Curated annotation (Swiss-Prot):
CDD domains: Radical_SAM. One of its GO terms (biological process) is tRNA modification. It catalyses: L-aspartate(89)-[ribosomal protein uS12]-hydrogen + (sulfur carrier)-SH + AH2 + 2 S-adenosyl-L-methionine = 3-methylsulfanyl-L-aspartate(89)-[ribosomal protein uS12]-hydrogen + (sulfur carrier)-H + 5'-deoxyadenosine + L-methionine + A + S-adenosyl-L-homocysteine + 2 H(+). This is Ribosomal protein uS12 methylthiotransferase RimO.
Length: 454
């Protein structure tokens, strides 16, 4: 009688945080699968659990600590990675080890090697790597029709409200050939929307002095504009979208707008402006000013009238006066940002902004955030209403039992923007499919979403 082969080790996985952290999770899962580990769908079925954490704001820290605690309670064998793993408390002690001393190991973000070393220590490899079992694009946690493409790690900025550089380090750009190869594999796998992400997409290549690389036998500089142009050319035969996130308004961004106007990439810019008043921006240690940003936005829209601009702002930053806040409101009225997120300032442990004088009371911070969002609702409603009657291409995300679909236009990034609700086809033989493009006519709008029919 032959002995049954040993059971394949199973790893549970919890992924928290931003799209950059999601990409880290995808890389870890890809490596686990390459080495023969299986993934478990529940704590009970896992031999150990990996928790990828977020540590940017206090709420994220608490969510991560709660997730670690749950994994320890339900499973007991937990490896922790991610931004919270690199974070210390006021005394310089490891936050995770202090709260959860029973975790098996703790690493910082973007630490594939360290995570795998910890896995090997507590759950040895089941067999030699089976790389041929993996799809070329690796394992993805997003739906099959869209994916995140991380082009760099870390950030060279030292914004006073942010601790990301202390957790993820300075900017490190990926070789452009590696980025292009991953993009090609994703398109070949059926991805219809590629979301380019980093901490600072505009700074791509700065750390390596825009070194010349090669793709398909041609020289391509490690620079944002050349990368975007190459991605647009690569996406064209697949009819796929390329969407840019975390774009700082450096001068060379102007060169990308004509590519958007020509349809090479989506006319969509995610630009984290944070504020408009020059004194507040100075305290934040942020570049540019409201006046300069207004000029840039107006110039961009002149070049590409269909441009959608998304941004985030902070209300109630330390020292923000009522006059400075009113300045921000005036800026928003003039800029008419299409998609906007606003956060009431929240102190982050380790951020230099904590030492700034004249903290704004919490109730005032929340009240100002509310005023920003109320104004933005009016702006968004006006801009979306202007789309009624127009025809646009949308990407189907979901189809319900009635045949109606939830989709997104080029103006809508997944999870953070609005959606387009598409009426079921009139012809019963026509069925929408997730991941396909459909041309629709916009029939209605509110402050967030659109309604349409094919």
């Amino acid at each position: 009688m032959t002995n049954a082969p040993p059971a394949t080790p199973k790893i549970g996985f919890v992924s928290l945080g931003c799209p950059k952290a999601l990409v880290d999770s995808e890389q870890i899962l890809t490596q686990l699968r390459a080495e023969g580990y299986d993934t478990a769908k529940s704590y009970d079925g896992a031999d150990l659990v990996i928790v990828n954490t977020c540590g940017f704001i206090d709420a994220a820290v608490q969510e991560s600590l709660d997730a670690i605690g749950e994994a320890l309670h339900e499973n007991g064998r937990v490896i922790v990675t991610g931004c919270l793993g690199a974070k210390k408390d006021a005394n310089g002690d490891d936050i995770i080890q202090k709260v959860h001393p029973k975790v098996l190991a703790v690493t910082g973000p973007h630490a594939l090697g360290e995570v795998m070393d910890a896995v090997h220590l507590h759950m040895p490899k089941p067999h030699a790597p089976f790389l041929d079992l993996l799809p070329p694009q690796g394992i993805k946690l997003t739906p099959k029709h869209f994916a995140y493409l991380k082009i760099s790690e870390g950030c060279n900025h030292r914004c006073s409200f942010c601790i990301i550089p202390s957790m993820r380090g300075d900017l490190v750009s990926r070789p452009i050939a590696d980025v292009m190869m991953e993009a090609e594999n994703l398109f070949k796998a059926g991805v219809k929307e590629l979301l380019v992400i980093s901490q600072d997409t505009s700074a791509y290549g700065v750390d390596i002095k825009f070194r010349m690389g090669f793709w398909n036998g041609k020289p391509v500089k490690t620079h944002m504009t050349q990368l975007v142009e190459a991605l647009g050319e690569l996406a064209a035969p697949y009819g796929a979208w390329v969407r840019l996130h975390y774009v700082y308004p450096y001068p060379h961004v102007d060169a990308i707008i004509p590519m958007m106007a020509e349809g090479k990439i989506l006319p969509y810019l995610d630009v984290p402006l944070q504020h408009a008043h020059p004194d507040v921006l100075k305290r934040m240690k942020r570049p540019a000013s409201g006046e300069k940003n207004i000029e840039r936005i107006q110039a961009w829209r002149a070049m590409c009238p269909d441009l959608t601009i998304r941004s985030t702002f902070i209300a109630g930053f330390p020292g923000e006066t009522e006059a400075e806040f009113e300045y921000l409101l005036d800026f928003l009225k003039e800029a008419e940002i299409d998609r906007l997120g606003c956060f009431a300032y929240s102190p982050v442990e380790g951020a230099t902004a904590n030492d700034l004088p004249n903290a704004v009371p919490e109730e005032v911070r929340e009240e100002r955030r509310g005023r920003v969002m109320l104004l933005q609702e009016e702006i968004s409603k006006k801009r979306l209403q202007a789309k009624v009657g127009k025809t646009m291409r949308v990407l189907i995300d979901e189809v319900n039992r009635t045949g109606a679909a939830t989709a997104r236009s080029g103006a809508d990034a997944p999870e953070i923007d609005g959606v387009v609700y598409v009426k079921a086809p009139y012809e019963p033989h026509i069925k929408y499919k997730v991941g396909e493009f459909v041309d629709v006519k916009i029939t209605g709008a509110d402050a967030h979403d659109l309604w349409a029919e094919a």
